[in-house]
From Swiss-Prot:
Record keywords, A-Z: Methyltransferase, S-adenosyl-L-methionine, Transferase, tRNA processing
Pfam families referenced in this protein's UniProt entry, alphabetically: Methyltransf_4 (PF02390)
Function per UniProt: Catalyzes the formation of N(7)-methylguanine at position 46 (m7G46) in tRNA.
Pathway: tRNA modification; N(7)-methylguanine-tRNA biosynthesis
The EC number(s) this enzyme carries: 2.1.1.33
Substrates-to-products reaction catalysed: guanosine(46) in tRNA + S-adenosyl-L-methionine = N(7)-methylguanosine(46) in tRNA + S-adenosyl-L-homocysteine
Family listed: Belongs to the class I-like SAM-binding methyltransferase superfamily. TrmB family.
Protein name: tRNA (guanine-N(7)-)-methyltransferase
Residues that coordinate or bind S-adenosyl-L-methionine: 34, 59, 86, 107
GO CC list: tRNA methyltransferase complex
Length: 202
């Protein structure tokens, strides 16, 4: 699933009005954010389906973000934007609270000494709590069973409210508009279970 490095990606992203460059941004009240957007397959599809909602993809690396940009341009999206940055700086990016956060197939950082880098580590969860609307929700999807259990443990540690959890998203009864990411499409074809948690901080 790795993309070949594109040396022109960063320049193209910075030249596009779809890429936010000045912070904090005056985001809309109904903003939906995906952290670790990758190629943007899920988020651009959602933006196309819901033109009245603002979708923002946060991505650390320019090459996959450029793929997302090309998708958005091809679809003529006016409600989709990109931030090139790190989740650790999330609180500096927005003036207004976020309605929904998606964490999709984040790097599991499997080595024990790297546990603080996992995007469901308690320090990151507290950052999400700071930017999320009081009625907002975080959705977490992963194929990694270890990361799923780690997320549950971390959420309990900070007394977050788990609304729903399942180790088999594609065969559960939870009502959610689930659009596949590239990774999810691949794992679905392999019949790999997808873990899912919906949580809030109220």
């Amino acid at each position: 699933m790795r993309l070949r490095f594109n040396k022109n990606a960063e320049t193209s992203l910075m030249a596009s009005p779809m890429t936010f460059k000045d912070f904090p941004i005056d985001n809309k009240k109904n903003t939906i954010l995906e952290i670790g957007m990758g190629r943007g397959t899920m988020l651009t599809k959602l933006a196309l389906m819901h033109p009245d909602i603002e979708y923002i993809g946060l991505e650390k690396y320019s090459t996959p973000a450029y793929s997302a940009l090309k998708k958005a341009i091809d679809l003529n999206l006016e409600n989709f934007h990109i931030i090139i940055g790190d989740a650790i700086n999330l609180s500096t990016y927005f003036k207004n609270k976020i309605k929904t956060i998606w964490l999709t197939f984040s790097d599991p950082w499997p080595k024990k000494r790297h546990y603080k880098r996992r995007l469901v580590y308690r320090d990151f969860l507290k950052i999400y709590q700071n930017v999320l609307d009081k009625d907002g929700v975080v959705y977490f999807k992963t194929d990694n069973d270890m990361l799923y259990q780690f997320a549950i443990d971390e959420l309990k540690e900070i007394n977050a409210k788990i609304i729903y959890q399942t180790s088999d998203l594609h065969h559960c009864n939870f009502k959610i508009e689930n659009v596949f990411t590239d990774y999810e499409e691949k794992f679905n074809k392999l019949n790999k279970n997808i873990n899912f948690i919906a949580f809030t901080f109220n």
